[in-house]
Amino acid sequence: MNKLTQGKFITFEGVDGIGKSTQSKMLYEYLKSQKIPVILTREVGGTTVAEKMREILVNEELLPMSELLQAMAARYDHMARKIIPALKDGYIVICDRFIDSTACYQGLELENGIDLVYSLHKTLMPSLMPDITFFIDVEPHTAIKRVNARNMSNKFDIRSIDFYKKIYTCFKELSNRFPERIKTIKASHLSPLEVHELIQKHL
């Protein structure tokens, strides 16, 4: 924890049903308990405008390019209104999903889409990438069982196991592509507390 300084941007990534939101909240509560200035946010969403865009994105069947541009527009609003001001004020920002989710969920649907996602992001906000990203690595079969046990669902929750495998493989490839930023936490057989303790060791 002594390496963690003010104004850092931390993101959590992975397929649905792996405990990202739980881990984001646990880290947020831990940092608060240490009197460290911190905010917790999410994507797609995080601002009033971006949350409205989220409703369309997760519930409507959009054309692949439309879906990507919707996600990027929501992110721009989120970054400009919330993330960047908080970082400038010295807060640690924890975000449940960010650019890597867009690469895997929207980028995979387009030819050369993953590279396009990072190119668009660099154009919109050239100086803003996460300082550290935690990829919560849970096997797709386990993740989809957890999702099916939830009462709420959206269009991403009800996809097939093949879809989950494709997204999982994408996150694995991104962790190899950006090894300095993305830290893989193998969590299939760990309790939430054990995962949280591993995350702390990387800070």
UniProtKB/Swiss-Prot annotation:
GO terms for cellular component: cytosol. ATP binds at G14, V15, D16, G17, I18, G19, K20, S21. Pfam families: Thymidylate_kin. The keyword Kinase applies. Its EC number is 2.7.4.9. InterPro entries: P-loop_NTPase (IPR027417), Thymidylate_kin-like_dom (IPR039430), Thymidylate_kin_CS (IPR018095), Thymidylate_kinase (IPR018094). Keywords: ATP-binding, Kinase, Nucleotide biosynthesis, Nucleotide-binding, Transferase. HAMAP family: Thymidylate_kinase. Phosphorylation of dTMP to form dTDP in both de novo and salvage pathways of dTTP synthesis. This is Thymidylate kinase. The gene is tmk.
